[in-house]
Structures are given as structure tokens and as C-alpha cells.
Amino acid sequence: MVMSRIVGIDLGTTNSLVATVDSGIPLVIADAEGQRLTPSVVHFPAPAADPVVGHAANRVRVLKPAETVYSAKRFIGRRGSEISQEEMLVTYPVKGAATGAVTIDIHGREYAPEEISAEVLKKLKRDAEAFIGEPVTRAVITVPAYFNDAQRNATKTAGELAGFTVERIVNEPTAAALAYGLDRLRERSRIAVYDLGCGTFDLSVLELNDGVFHVLSTNGNTRLGGDDLDKRIVDFLVEKIKAAGGPDLTDKSEIRNPKSEMLPMLSRIREAAEQAKIKLSTETAVEVPLPFLASTFSFTYRLTRQELEDLTRDIIARTRVHCLRSLADAKLEPKDLDQVILVGGQTRMPLVRRFVAELFACAELEEPSGEIRRDSDYHKPKGPRLNTSQNPDEAVALGAAIQAEILSGGFKNMLLLDVTPLSLGIETFGGLMNVIIPRNSTIPVKAGEVFTTAVDNQRSMLIHVLQGERERASDNWSLGRFTLDFESAPKGTPRVGVQFEIDANGILHVLARDLKTAKQKVVKIKSAVDVDDAEVQKMVDESVEHAFEDLRARQWIETALRARQTIAAARKGLVECVGEIDADYRTKVEQALKTVENLVADGEAATQPGDAAKLKAALTALDEVTQPLADLMMDKAMEAQLRKRGLVK
């Protein structure tokens, strides 16, 4: 049986593309109108009517804003509690459902964001089938590198709803590097991929060596992109319109009313703002015409590139911290890079290109693209080259097509090694996180450890899966919990193997197995980090800021656990050997025990971790005092074993 061709898809916030490899050449497939970019826009004309997708939907967005969905990628795989800021960017009703998921209400029906994305994917599927001339059922779909597990799963679901078997979920910057790397397979080079799209930003650092693409690190923000620039321009124009005597469109609460007269006006302003932003990448000033914005009001404004840059400079600057973190994770400096690749339509903006050139101390460009200031201090003759040779809108889709070809058996001299951006582990006794897969581990990856019980007669073990960079479980994010049952046994006897596996799509599977009975549970983690990217970055920052405090906490918790075990063993020995030790020795043991018990109790009562060094010293003293007791207990245990075997009477 001949397998169908695998296509590569860039499912974007504003535009989506489908690509394939034909006769060894990756290319983007055009639709029936000859357009290679398909707007990620879906219009629902009536409750029972088929949705309109792409350019046709985009054309009616201004007229029917409450029934036309765009930028659905911003909501995919997210909880309703996270959407308050983003819902101000759209003109259709978005809300959090009772289950916590985000839904979009059109004509009285609630749609999940993945259902909207599925309609876009169906359109791409039809376009690909028309071009190839055969059914297309397999796809590689790209996502932002910093998408969490829930967002990746939702993207995969969207592909399946569209009729695809999703062969692989690939990070967008990694796919772009594949597209740029085709003609340099034998070079060894380090590349930074600066990917600023309409809804997301990623900075990935990769090493290309003899056809192997190894992702060294990735960092980003899935809530930062060109949409934020559009909103800033819209807010600016709204104030200008109000000052010119036009309608007051500053009441954001009206946006939530699908029947509001503001929606068509705001939709027109948003479209005009987006077009002006695009034109200002090649022009220094543009007219923003809004004729008959209201029945008796028309408006025109001449927007300059300088005004645009002043309005949006702080948004672009927010990408800086992600770039520096990614470089730090890769243990590199800008001078260690060979190239910086620009990906995403927003990187056409001259301000972005100047910002990137300055941040990475790029060497001079051969062409004045982006109006890079030549001979400025931040340009180094031996710095990395700012590579703009690929179409930034198409690079990701082309890379996805190349990955699809690799999976099909083509391009055998290429290999893609991606990474996971955050550490994964489980909670252990005492409330600590035990890391099983560290952050920036190359995926796919599989790792595991063996754990045991800390309580006598325990009949089950709760596996609490965590993600984050802190020492204490409570400071990290909970991905899920499940229980593995086993036979009752003394503490330390059961042995439970826990294995984490991150597949090539970046999706986590957790296996827990009782090594005695082989009883096991396998859980697919469907909801990863249910927080926004500000919280993701807060986690990384706090892991550095609180590193010393976390280390103290871990040292205290581990020492306190050992202290409790030692106390229990010593108390047991005093009971079992009550007739074989004198009163003076018992008093010495009791005093040493009391010292340790008091230190543990004081540490538990305090708001800060106790003094681990002082507790360790007290434990050492207790160990020395109880050594004769331990020897006596060992002798009694050996005698019992010999008597059991009939070797002594």
C-alpha cells in the first residue's frame, strides 16, 4: 500500500500556509486564487451554513465582526481564566466555559479554538489535494517553541478534526532553521532564530553540524506578537478620532456586546492599522483613510514610521529578555553565533531589524534591508550575520515540509533534535520536586527512576507530576496526579519505577510500574502549564532569584527526613532492648534524641527552613551515641535469623 504524502503546515495566528517537497524542492502551495498565504480567519454566515475560510472570510470581517473569528491561535489550549487581556484584542465573543476551557460563541453555539483552527486546516487540506492531485491525510504542523503540553495537544486535535493524521508537532523556529539550512548541510554553525509572528515570539539557538540540527535552547512568549502592535496603533487612532470630534470608542466594555455599533468601526480601524503597519516597513509615511467611519464622520490620518516606532518600541524591547535567557541557557554569547535568522512577518519591520542587529552585534548586511545603521558601534565586523535571505512568512512552512519529507524517508542526511523548555519531575516525600527530565533536554526523550515508600503498610503511591525549576513541589506547576496501588508492605520495601517520555511532538507520557507485580499505569498529560507566559518567565526568574533559599529548603527537608527516620529507629531500639541497656546509657540516648526532636519541631514551626547544619551536627552526635544500641539490635537480628534456621538454640 502506498502511503499518502505528508505535507508541512504553518498554522499561524494571522496567516497559515501548507507546503510540500516536489522533486527535492520545498515549496508553498497556492490556493485556487493563486494566494500562498491563507488568512487564519473563519466566518460563520448563519447557524446552519458552512463556514467561510481564508480570504473570503477576511473580506467580510469588517462587515460582520462578531461572526468572524481571527487570531484563534491565541486561545488554543488555554483556560478561560487567562483570557481577560486577549479578549480586548478581538471583536467576537470569547469566554471561559464551566470546564475552564476557552470557547467562542457564534450564533448561539460555543466553539473551541481548535474547532476554529480545524476549519483553517480543512481549507489548507483542500488546497494541497488540488495541487498534488491525490488525497492528503498526513501532516506535520508547527507550533511556537514555548507552547505548553495543553496547547500542543489542542493543535494536534485541530489537525485530527480536519482529517489529518498529525505525524509530528514541530517548533516553529526549528522548522525555520531547517528551511535555511538546506544548502549548508556540511557546515558547522551556530544559529539563533528570532521568530516574531502576529501572536507569538520565540528565540531558539541551534547548532548545525553535518546535517544534524541540535536545538541548544529555546525561550519565548506565546502572548507577544504583531497583534500587540496592531492594538497599540488602534488605541492611538481611537484617541485621534475622539480628539477630532468623532465617535468615542474608548469604552472597552462595549466590545463584549456582539450587537454594539462600535464593533464594525473598531474592526475597520484595526484593518486600517494593520495595513498601515505593513506599508511602513517599506515607506516612511502612509495615509490611514477611514471614510464614513460613522454616518456623519470621516477620518484620515498620516501615520509616519517614526510615530509607529515610538508607539511600539517598548513591545519590541520585551523580546530582549527572552533572547538573553535563551543565549544563557545555551551557554553562548552573541559573538559565538554565526547567523541570526529572522522569521515571522513582523520581522520585516525596520525597527525589529535594527533592534536584532544591535542586540546580537550583527555584522553589516550586504543589502540595506531594514535600514541598518552602518558603521555604528554595535555592528561588529566579525559578528553574526543577520540572515534575511528567506521569505519570513514562508520559512516555517517550508521547514515543516522538509521535516515531513524526512519522515517520509527523504533528505536522509538531515536530522532534527529539539528540546523541552522546562524541567519535569514528581513530588517526593517531604514536598520536594525530583527532576526526571531537566529543561533543555533533547526530545524525544525517555528517563525514569525507582522510588519506594516512606510509611509502613502503604498500599498505594500518589504520582504527582510537576513542571518547573524550583526545589519545592509547591513552588512548581502541577500537571496532574494519579495513584498506583500495590500490596501492603513495610516502608522501603515496595519498588515503583516512574518513567517520563516526551514524544517527538513534545507531549508527555508518564508510566508508573510496581516492579514486584508488574502492575502499571500509563497517563498522557493533557493539561500542562495552565498559566500565561508572564508566569512562565516568573518561574524561571524565581528559580535564579531564590536559588540559595531553595537550596537551604532542600537541605533542611532532606536532613529533617533523615532525622525522623533516625529518631524512629532509635526509639524502636530502646523498646526492643529495654532489658539489655543500663539507665545511664538510656539517659544519654534520650538526651541526644530530645536535641534532635526539638530542632526538627522548631524548624517545622518556623516560617523559614530550619538550620540544616545544626540539625546535621545533632544527628551526628545521635549516631555516635546510638552506635552501641545499633550494634546490639544487629546482634539480636542475626541471632533471630540463626535461630530461625535452626543453627542456634
PLM regions and their residue ranges:
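Oxyanion-binding/catalytic loops of NTP- or PPi-dependent enzymes
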Residues: M1-A98, H107-E114, E119, R126-K649
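Trp/Tyr-centric glycan-recognition "aromatic platform" motifs on solvent-exposed beta-strand/loop surfaces
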Residues: G100-V102
